[in-house]
Amino acid sequence: MKELYVVNCCRTAVGSFGGSLKNTPAAELGAIVVKEALKRANVAPENVDELMFGCILTSGLGQNVARQVGVGAGLPYSVPAYTVGMVCGSGMKSVIEAGRAILAGDADIIVCGGTENMSAAPYASTDARWGARMGDKKLVDTMIKDGLWDAFNNYHMGTTAENICDVWGITREELDAFGAASQQKTEAAQASGRFDAEIVPVPVKVKKEIIEFKKDEFPRAGSTPEGLAKLKGAFPVGPEGVEDQIVHTFQPTEIHEADTRKHVQRVTAGNASGINDGAAAIVLASGEAVKKYNLKPMAKLIGWGQGGVDPKIMGVGPVPASRQAMAKAGVTIDDIDLVEANEAFAAQSIAVARELHFDMSKVNVNGGAISIGHPVGASGARIIVTLLHEMLKREDAKKGLATLCIGGGQGVATVFEKC
């Protein structure tokens, strides 16, 4: 069987909503990281067989964002590209599809990843094309509609996190403790330069000057559980009796009865991920390509998994996906030295950690999406980049797991072994 190698990878710093990257198009962010990833990998653009890139909020961006990324990065016109759409899992799904293509013998070197500018997502009119006739009309926020809204139950992703609190018995205190811990870990990581090696600067215009944007700007220094406890609930709770309406695709075993206050708001801006901008790129190659071009890979991709859950509790999608990925890789959770589990919400992160029996000292050691941010189309690739760079810094970190939940009730996971 062919071996799959991550030759190199990088990401932009993550921008806040309406922050430093708001005027940088998603395709441009993607092109910057692809160009840098190829440079770091020592792979010539003409040796790339295909580009696969995630992007969710594509309204108004023009045809095939991935193609724009590839051409913008200097790939020859002969190199095909396609845009991957699996909501939050898109960046990681691109890696899985690249792995499949290489194993099938269709390619030897594929650039994958994801990009998103949530700040630039437009508002849309749904009735203007055929004539609004008269009266005021409503605009649709495509950032919410296409990125953060459950199409099956007609409510925000935040409500699915409230549902998880109800099912798994997760308290507001647990959520705020988790959110504060994420912020504190990221604050320490930034202070020590832990992210420096994985970030490629993005030139941005500030007034009349061009500066380099190279530090995640979403983290909130000084966060504490006590401070987060003062924040108000951000999302409507799920309907009464939602626990009895959920169809479980795996049997929950770690349900706590700690919180009897069902259907009260617990999810806040402090224990949920942000709305953010950013991009990440990964160069994946076959073993044959590694030998042919004398490449120096970072890690092997040794397994992946995908799974589905009831959309009402979409955040626990990583449970079946991670189990599948680890089974394919021939490992158990005890073999995993580092975990990057995307923090869409503290609620789902806690439920996933319980069900997968995570050792929390190994999970998101430099913080996660609650502190770093969650540019939806890029996050699946971003957490792989962060995982692999952290594994390189730790001599005892041999194997790593990266996983995300996906709006609509899915999960995706990948397992890596350090070279």
Task: List where the protein language model places each region.
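Conserved active-site "lid/cap" helical segment
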Residues: 1-61, 65-73, 77-80, 160-172, ...
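Beta-strand segments within the central parallel beta-sheet cores of soluble alpha/beta enzyme folds
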Residues: 6, 46-54, 80-85, 110-115, ...
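N-terminal extracellular/periplasmic Venus flytrap/periplasmic-binding protein-like
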Residues: 10-12, 22-32, 40, 177-284, ...
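Active-site pocket-shaping loop/turn-to-helix segments
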Residues: 12-38, 57-59, 82-99, 119, ...
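Conserved catalytic cysteine-centered active-site region
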Residues: 55-109, 152-156, 222, 229-274, ...
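Flexible glycine-/small-residue-enriched beta->alpha junction loops
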Residues: 109-164
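Conserved N-terminal phosphate-binding loop of PLP-dependent enzymes in the Aspartate aminotransferase
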Residues: 116, 121-123, 158, 163, ...
